[in-house]
Regions:
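Structural beta-sheet core signal
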Residues: 10, 36, 96, 200-201, ...
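Glycine-rich beta-alpha junction loops
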Residues: 41-42, 98-105, 204-206
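Hydrophobic alpha-helical scaffolding
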Residues: 46, 69, 73, 142, ...
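Thiamine diphosphate
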Residues: 1-60, 65-88, 174-249
Length: 249
């Protein structure tokens, strides 16, 4: 459907995601703006479990997909929009991940985004360009060719150039969602003491529990903080370093 110019999304996790990996390499490598929403769960190994775990999406780190992480139902609502908007503008495949059951089945009141607020944020020129590149007998193209190592290497290096624009694109749309919602999303959100000497780095629902721990420890004389990862892939070292207080040891 993506090759035909249709905006395509799916929802999956665990073993279902494992079955998609071969196709993900093709979609990620061809920069098709698919979006997958992943309620991350255990992948069966020596035992079976249906509960939350990062095994499934961690297995997909080399597929060429960007990975956006949510820690709560509200974040899942807001960052889902960021994933879709960024996929179109950057011309990049996205996974939007949140913890299975802990977040995906949590009963919580949220503020739903209005589609009319999101409509002006869509990059229509990028959308038209994506549809123009779709398979069409009126303007045939050749894709998925067999190439020698020299060309393969150049294509891989070209993918790095494409990935380099993703962090700024994601932050741009986070800023737009911040304007609509009044919330404060960044690629890496910092929480805790401004002069923290110890900082823990987490992503997804663990950050909600860590925030309570940070509050408790700071109230008892410790200087601690939390860096919450939202954009895990492509990982921006520059933005990550900027989120950590200079006092951190």
């Amino acid at each position: 459907s993506l090759q035909a110019g249709a905006l395509t999304t799916t929802f999956t996790s665990s073993q279902g995601l494992m079955l998609m990996i071969p196709a993900m390499y093709a979609m990620g490598g061809q920069f098709l703006p698919s979006v997958m929403h992943i309620a991350s769960r255990v992948v069966t190994s020596n035992h079976h479990s249906i509960f939350g775990d990062h095994t499934d999406f961690m297995t997909c780190r080399t597929t060429g997909y960007a990975m956006l992480m949510s820690s709560s139902p509200q974040e899942a609502m807001d960052l889902a929009a960021v994933a879709h908007l960024s996929a179109i503008k950057a011309g990049y495949a996205f996974m939007h991940c949140f913890d299975g059951f802990r977040t995906s089945h949590e009963m919580q009141r949220i503020e739903a985004l209005d589609y009319e607020d999101l409509r002006p944020l869509m990059d229509t020129e990028a959308l038209d360009a994506f549809r123009h590149k779709s398979l069409n007998p009126e303007h045939p193209t050749n894709r998925g060719n067999n190439v020698n190592p020299d060309i393969y290497f150049q294509c891989k290096e070209g993918a790095n150039v494409k990935a380099a624009v993703v962090p700024e694109t994601v932050q741009h749309y986070m800023d737009e969602i911040n304007k609509i919602t009044g919330r404060d999303y960044k690629l890496f959100n910092y929480y805790g003491a401004e002069d923290a000497e110890e900082v823990i780095v987490v992503m997804c629902s663990a950050s909600e529990a860590v925030k309570e721990t940070v509050d408790f420890l700071n109230a008892n004389g410790r200087k601690v903080g939390l860096v919450q990862i939202h954009l895990y892939r492509p990982f921006s070292v520059e933005h990550f370093a900027a989120a950590i207080p200079a006092s951190c040891k």
